[in-house]
A protein has these predicted regions:
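Short beta-strand element of Class I
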Residues: 82-85
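C-terminal substrate-binding/active-site "lid" region of AdoMet-derived donor-dependent transferases
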Residues: 160-195
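Conserved SAM/SAH-binding beta-strand->alpha-helix loop
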Residues: 90
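Conserved SAM-binding loop
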Residues: 97
Length: 195
């Protein structure tokens, strides 16, 4: 038995093993385009950040579902050769990212200026990035909401209609979850996509 020690909450689910509809749902999304209209705030955020990305001319790293942006800061520190976009749907969480003058996240180094935090809908932002022909060097999905109820499969990134965009963005994918079934399902979805 493997004992994992950490401060993450224990995930409970009515699902044992891979979701029985996983293959069907993933294959459906791989065969059909996601045509939902873009939300205005995400479209505007993309247009603004697209200019910054072009000006930088560096490899692009996504830190999706970044919460308060602590992981984004550390990724930026570890990858000075790249630009990092930390993205979350919650403006409240992002507002808790330390700014100059606040002591937190290892006393933020003000020389780390290769990242931006964005409040966006990832379903839209990832598709916009694909349309703009962006290719990532890395994509971090660190502890996304696992949606552990079996009926919520399509709320998980690998079960959602935007999953093909995650694949098209490319790059080294770093997925972490406190629910092992989430990781196993994501791996199966990648296999179904030929990755």
């Amino acid at each position: 038995m493997i004992e994992i020690i950490g401060d993450s909450r224990i995930i409970t689910s009515n699902q044992n093993g891979l979701n029985e509809k996983l293959d069907e749902v993933v294959l459906k999304h791989l065969q059909h385009d996601f045509k939902k209209p873009y939300q205005t705030h995400t479209l505007e955020a993309f247009k603004k950040i697209e200019k910054w990305v072009e000006q930088q001319g560096k490899p692009i790293i996504f830190d999706s579902c970044c919460g308060v942006g602590e992981s984004t800061y550390h990724i930026a520190k570890a990858h000075p050769e790249a630009i990092i976009l930390g993205m979350d749907k919650s403006a409240d969480r992002l507002s808790k990212h330390p700014v100059d003058g606040e002591l937190s996240i290892d006393d933020l180094d003000s020389n780390i200026n290769n990242y931006q935090l964005l409040q966006v809908n990832l379903n839209d932002f990832w598709r916009l990035a694909v349309e703009a022909n962006w290719t990532l060097s890395h994509h971090y999905l660190l502890y996304p909401n696992p949606w552990p109820k079996a009926k919520h499969l399509q709320r998980r990134w690998h079960g959602s209609a935007v999953f093909p965009s995650i694949i098209e963005l490319g790059g080294k994918l770093d997925l972490r979850s406190n629910w092992f079934t989430y990781v196993e399902e994501f791996q199966r979805a990648l296999q179904l996509a030929g990755k």
